[in-house]
């Protein structure tokens, strides 16, 4: 498994620009632009790339342009949500298994570093009324993923999943610190903490957002999404040396 850097790349914008939660619209990058961007992420020293089946072309493009560098980065994806104009959720065993196998094919890899349950807003029900986590644990035992994670919304679901998972993904930023307590509980258990929406979907400037998140010692990786190599360079510059690797 590749070293895990404090800054990771969230590859949403590489593949999807419909029904996003960002405060601005954007054009999808071309194939050539995607190639340059994704390889630049690794060239800049970022070793964590996160994607999902619901991110449009994201998985396919990562597989196309980074499979030859697979040993250089920690690759996470998700299962449970798909998107074709609208989000659809299916946490059945068959759907989770099919999702992971499809992701492996699109990403052109034999094993994933982590697969997160991609929960909808009723994440307690996803955790307690489906076999999503258990199915991923079975796939982990079969060697298809090294870690199992849960991407959720409520403190209750995150706290309840901790005995089962290796990683969590939660929102945490200057405007939303509700998960701070459960993030620390996760870290105390040795569960990796991945932070999404660290810049509050672009409403908090990077120079304020990045130090705020990374000064929290429970955080493993802050995921950032950008289509600009220059912005990525600036964000890395804002990351103190003591935070480079977690």
Predicted regions and their residues:
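A structural motif
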Residues: 43-46, 109-112, 145, 165, ...
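Short, acidic/polar
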Residues: 24-41, 91-108, 151-160, 205-212
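Acidic (Asp/Glu)-rich catalytic clusters
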Residues: 3, 63-74, 104-110, 140, ...
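N-terminal binding-site loop/beta-alpha segment at the start of enzyme catalytic domains
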Residues: 1-73
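Beta/alpha (TIM)-barrel catalytic core signal, keyed to glycine-rich beta->alpha loops juxtaposed to Asp/Glu
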Residues: 120-246
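Conserved, mostly hydrophobic/aromatic
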Residues: 9, 41, 49, 62, ...
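Active-site groove signature of glycoside hydrolases
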Residues: 104-123
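Active-site mouth loops of central-metabolism enzymes
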Residues: 14-32, 82-97, 119, 123-125, ...
């Amino acid at each position: 498994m590749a070293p895990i850097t404090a800054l990771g790349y969230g590859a949403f914008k590489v593949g999807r620009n419909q029904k996003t939660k960002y405060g601005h619209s954007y054009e999808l990058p071309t194939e050539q632009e995607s190639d340059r961007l994704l390889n630049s992420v690794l060239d800049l020293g970022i070793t964590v790339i996160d994607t999902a089946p619901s991110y449009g072309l994201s998985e396919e493009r990562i597989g196309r342009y980074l499979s030859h560098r697979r040993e250089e980065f920690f690759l996470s994806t998700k299962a449970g949500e798909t998107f074709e104009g609208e989000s659809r959720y299916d946490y059945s065993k068959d759907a989770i298994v099919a999702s992971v196998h499809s992701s492996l094919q699109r990403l052109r890899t034999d094993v994933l570093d982590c697969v997160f349950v991609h929960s909808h807003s009723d994440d307690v029900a996803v955790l307690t009324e489906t076999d999503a986590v258990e199915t991923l644990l079975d796939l982990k035992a079969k060697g298809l993923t090294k870690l199992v994670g849960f991407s959720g919304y409520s403190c209750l679901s995150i706290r309840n999943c901790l005995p089962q998972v290796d990683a969590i993904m939660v929102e945490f930023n200057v405007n939303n610190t509700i998960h701070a307590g459960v993030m620390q509980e996760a870290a105390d258990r040795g569960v990796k903490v991945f932070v999404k929406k660290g810049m509050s979907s672009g409403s908090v400037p990077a120079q304020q957002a990045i130090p705020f998140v990374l000064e929290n010692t429970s955080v493993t990786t802050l995921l950032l999404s950008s289509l600009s190599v220059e912005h990525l360079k600036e964000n890395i510059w804002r990351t103190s040396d003591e935070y480079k690797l977690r």
